[in-house]
Regions:
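N-terminal leader/targeting and accessory segments in enzymes
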Residues: 1-94, 278, 349-351, 377-392, ...
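Residue-level signal for inorganic ion chemistry
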Residues: 9, 41, 60, 95, ...
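Phosphate-binding loop of NTP-binding sites
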Residues: 10-13, 91-217, 221, 227-237, ...
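Acidic, Mg2+-coordinating active-site environments of NTP-dependent enzymes
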Residues: 13, 73-78, 185-327, 351-352, ...
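Active-site beta-alpha connecting loops in nucleotide-dependent enzymes
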Residues: 50-51, 313, 331, 335-405, ...
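ATP-dependent carboxylate/acyl-activation modules
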Residues: 110, 314-316, 433-439
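Peripheral docking tails and interdomain loops at the edges
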Residues: 405, 423-444
Length: 449
């Protein structure tokens, strides 16, 4: 994490101090939450829609903060060491940008409509075999989270893996202005946040903002929109590699499915690669990892070991055993592309019974009802044995799948419980706001009672 003095920070931000006699006060790390402040931290009071972090300075001091940012329009200034700034959020971002420029690590930037968190976890598992590596924790991938991730990097980090999310035009451009990625990966371009972008081509245009900030880009090439947007953006000095159905650099051969993972072949690896995660799409996510690893001279044995020992982030195709059943917790988010991929993964698991537990996909715009119905039709075509749905929009999914719609999670949970004593695979998926992970928690608690 960042280790410096308040005077150095004030100088980097071209501002002044207040409330202190000693400008050499050392800080160790930062926090934007007064409840999580650690001794030696710099407290950064963010002003949100409902809460102003300035009101929690006393709590931050009690927990050990030694200094704080302070917005100049908040007078009087406290009798406490503060760094005066015009906007605490902008100052957080500017501090992260300055700190990133002081580091000598290789930065790998990862974005994509789907798969970026899985790819990030794979990169970390592989690169940790050779280098001191740090990665984005949780979902810290936006205009607040990415600066927090950067400021949590150690001075001697060798590889920084930074996940970058996107909700609006310009988001990737802004995050790259802080991260300055050396190697960039676009895992997919789908319909997530279609409501904000209007078209898949605009989503591609937003993701490809990364192209003007990087030295090397590896992208998942699945749609003609990519070609159209690539032709708009000058990228003559960028090394460009692609993978996927229309890719030209990395090609997957045979994929063998196991109950607890997959094995696949790749044109750039001498031996088959085994992974402790499920789904053909995870083999595709591994391709840019292989590319990036070879760029940094990681040998194939280390790549193979890293991909076989991945620690996945919770709620992203996380495998959980409850009773005799295998639960696939993919409850962090859902959109049409990721839902179809998740159903493909479910159907590929070698088990006698497959159950899809689905809830609403949000932010899809005016076609939301038909898109939910398409997921139900797809589940039916795959031959999923049971499709259980909850949520207003998921009524259309259940209807098209010839499945069952429940008016509450509790009634759905009661229908699921008997299956826990059988050899079956159960997929749980929905947009984050639907909190489908509660179903898994309740099933686990019931099993332990």
């Amino acid at each position: 994490m960042i280790q410096t003095t308040i005077q150095t920070i004030a100088k980097a931000l071209d501002t002044s101090l207040s409330g202190c006699n000693d400008s050499d006060i050392s800080i160790s790390g930062i926090s934007i939450d007064s409840r999580t402040v650690q001794p030696g931290n710099l407290y950064i009071p963010i002003i949100g829609e409902r809460v102003d972090g300035h009101t929690f300075l006393d709590s931050a001091k009690t927990n050990g903060a030694v200094a704080s940012f302070w917005q100049i329009d908040h007078k009087p200034y406290p009798d406490f060491p503060v760094i005066l700034v015009k906007d605490t959020t902008v100052a957080l971002q500017d501090l992260a940008r300055a700190y990133m420029q002081s580091l000598s690590c290789t930065v790998i930037g990862v974005t994509g409509s789907n798969g970026k968190t899985s790819c990030k976890d794979m990169l970390y598992s592989v690169f940790s075999q050779k280098y001191k590596t740090q990665k984005t924790q949780g979902n810290h991938n936006n205009e607040i989270g990415l600066p927090l991730t950067v400021l949590d990097l150690d001075a001697d980090v060798e590889i920084a893996i930074l996940e970058m999310g996107m909700e609006h035009k310009g988001d990737i451009n802004f995050l790259c202005s802080i991260a300055s990625p050396d190697i960039s990966i676009i895992t997919s371009i789908g319909s997530a946040h279609m409501e904000n972008f209007g078209s898949k081509e605009n989503i591609a245009r937003g993701k490809l903002e990364i192209l003007t900030h990087t030295k090397s880009l590896c992208l998942y090439h699945t749609c003609p929109e990519i070609d159209a947007v690539l032709s708009e953006i000058p990228h003559g000095e960028v090394t460009l590699h692609s993978f996927g159905p229309h890719g030209d650099s990395y090609i997957i051969g045979d994929i063998i499915h196991h109950k607890d993972g997959i094995t696949f072949t790749c044109n750039d690896m001498e031996n088959p690669v085994s992974m402790n995660v499920l789904g053909d799409f995870q083999a595709e996510n591994a391709l840019p990892v292989i590319y990036a690893a070879k760029t940094k001279q990681i040998d194939e044995n280390a790549i193979e070991y890293g991909l076989e020992h991945i620690e996945m982030t919770k709620m992203r195709t996380q495998q959980i055993t409850i009773g005799q059943a295998t639960i696939i917790d993919d409850s962090y988010k859902s959109n049409p592309e990721s839902a179809k991929v998740a159903l493909d993964t479910l159907s590929s698991i070698p088990t006698p019974c497959h159950i899809a537990v689905l809830s609403d996909m949000l932010d899809l715009g005016e076609n939301e009802e038909s898109l939910h119905a398409q997921i139900g039709t797809y589940a039916h075509q795959l031959g999923i044995d049971y499709v259980f749905c909850v949520g207003d929009l998921s009524f259309y999914t259940a209807d098209a799948a010839q499945g069952t719609w429940f008016d509450s999670k509790q009634s759905l949970i009661q229908a699921l419980r008997p299956f826990l004593d059988t050899d079956c695979a159960i997929l749980v998926k929905g947009s984050r706001a639907t909190a489908m992970d509660q179903i898994i928690t309740d099933l686990q608690q019931g099993e332990n009672e």
